């Protein structure tokens, strides 16, 4: 039995070219029952002007997801803690992934997916027992766990990270977590946001002091371990270094021979070493693609024709 779920994409303007390329692959390889794009008002206007969306995609202003969860309010809280205002957008994205569960129309399950990431193989998010499949990663950042402990009283109990380019949320569990975050009080957007920002250590408020995926993963793995299954799944973050920010179908097919998804992050190269690395990876990408397309030409044509 297929478990229904919706997919939400939080995006900014610089990710729109990748999102335009990636959306057909999201439909093909993830096949959600509903897609919602969440962005600033100006970004939504640009999306409408580009006109690459189908009519069934829902557009939602980031300041209207849940009352009280706004960029201005997050910026105010970050600055009041002595943090840099420029980090507010980074925190807002994560807070919105949590807040989406508070919307009454939200489905029982919702998948968050990074807008700069393209799936290149079919990906399932539930096993045959209905357990949510969570990606297992190797990242470790101690301040995340200091915040988790201050926020909900849980320590790190696993030797891996839940931080990937997506997360499958069960609305029921997320609402329970939010109630824990507001400490039994009335579940309001402003209260939950304030409690999260307040829990971050002052030394890390201007950096990376909170991770929604690490927080949710830690909570669910502790409270409902039989509801999830952690898996190793192959992915790559430096798709842009290999193939640029406008990957072709042949680029994506090449990636699909090794990975389930690829991210195309628009990092700025600042040092000579970074420039050399990017040049080398771009050359390797061209060689890799040439070999794959030549040796697997029929499979490539099939991959291309289905999109």
Region roles according to the model:
Residues 117-151:
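Conserved donor-nucleotide/metal-binding helix-loop-beta segment in metal-dependent transferases, i.e.
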């Amino acid at each position: 039995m297929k478990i229904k779920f919706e997919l939400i994409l939080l995006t900014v303007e610089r990710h729109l070219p990748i999102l335009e390329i990636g959306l057909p692959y999201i439909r093909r390889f993830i096949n959600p029952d509903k897609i919602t794009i969440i962005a600033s008002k100006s970004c939504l206007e640009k999306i409408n002007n580009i006109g690459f969306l189908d009519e069934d995609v829902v557009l939602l202003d980031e300041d209207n997801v849940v009352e009280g969860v706004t960029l201005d309010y997050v910026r105010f809280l970050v600055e009041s803690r002595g943090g840099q205002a420029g980090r507010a957008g980074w925190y807002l994205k994560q807070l919105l992934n949590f807040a989406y569960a508070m919307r009454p129309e939200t489905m029982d399950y919702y998948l968050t997916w990074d807008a700069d990431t393209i799936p290149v193989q079919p990906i399932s998010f539930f096993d045959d027992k209905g357990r949510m499949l969570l990606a297992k990663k190797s990242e470790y950042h101690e301040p995340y766990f200091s915040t988790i402990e201050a926020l909900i009283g849980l320590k790190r109990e696993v030797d891996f990270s839940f931080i990937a380019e997506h997360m499958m949320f069960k609305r029921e569990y997320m609402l329970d977590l939010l109630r824990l975050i507001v400490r039994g009080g009335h579940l309001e957007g402003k209260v939950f946001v304030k409690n999260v920002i307040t829990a971050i250590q002052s030394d890390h408020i201007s950096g990376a002091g909170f991770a929604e995926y690490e927080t949710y993963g830690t909570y669910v793995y502790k409270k409902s371990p039989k509801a999830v299954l952690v898996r190793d799944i192959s992915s790559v973050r430096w798709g842009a270094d290999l193939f640029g920010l406008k990957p072709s179908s042949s680029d994506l097919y090449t990636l699909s021979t090794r990975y389930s998804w690829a991210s195309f992050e628009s990092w700025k190269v600042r040092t000579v070493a970074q420039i050399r690395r990017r040049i080398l990876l771009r050359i390797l990408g061209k060689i890799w693609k040439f070999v794959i397309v030549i040796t697997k030409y029929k499979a490539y044509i099939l991959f291309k024709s289905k999109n």
